[in-house]
Amino acid sequence: EVYGLSGWVSHHNLDIWGHSGPVGYFGQDEDPCSYSMWPMSSGWLCRHLWEHYCYTEDLDFLKDRAYPVIEGAVKFYLGFLFPYGEYYVTGPSTSPENRFCGEDGKSHSVGMASTMDISILKELFGYYLKICNTLGIEGEKADVKRVLSKLPPFKTGSFGQIREWFLDYPETEIHHRHVSHLYGLYPGNLITEKNPELLEACRVALERRGDEGTGWCMAWKACLWARLRDGEHALGLLKNQLRYTR
């Protein structure tokens, strides 16, 4: 109803009443769009359904429970994406809670095709095609294949880091606790040792962010360092997370 599109979508906030639309302190926060305008949690949540099947190989679960939910999310994103040059992009788009310095020299949070958005969609569309093939269902395969082939590639920024946004904008908060642009490394599986250049770009991005953050952010960073085969760094973050506080 909010977007006038088919399928379903959820944002950063879910509650016991099933409300999943954008929620923010509009008129109070300086920039509520930086956290509320994020229609990508449905894509992330679908990943857990796919992982459940990968571990259990439960075809009944895949067909009866996972597929209908995942297909609904896919339908929404097929309608949400739009052509921009040679690519299909998301918009409005954010890298949750972080901001960038625009060409006008001002701080902004809303752009298009953030790296996190595209990473989530590449994974979602990828395993949707696998599900269709496994179940022998045509579904939205043709449109998904067409759009997937035109999603923007990962790009590196001026510091050798994975870009956070579609264009090489400088972030206004280098040490922001979120590492949304590294979703493709973890929890995703888009960036692996088969892509050494992208792995190094992830390392640079993670080093620029630093180790500080809230509890869940430290846990995410520990997982990212583990994916980068740096167990000592991951262990250091876990020890820091489990220390006594006063």
Regions found by a protein language model. Give the residues of each.
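Active-site core of glycosidic bond-cleaving carbohydrate-active enzymes
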Residues: 1-2, 8-9, 27, 33-59, ...
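Generic preference for hydrophobic/aromatic residues in regular secondary structure cores
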Residues: 7-19, 81, 112, 162-166
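Acidic/His metal-coordination segments adjacent to aromatic residues that form catalytic metal sites
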Residues: 14-37, 93-113, 244-246
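Structured mid-domain segments that build the active-site/substrate or prosthetic-cofactor binding neighborhood
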Residues: 48-51, 70, 75-80, 186
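Acidic/histidine-rich catalytic neighborhood
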Residues: 72-131
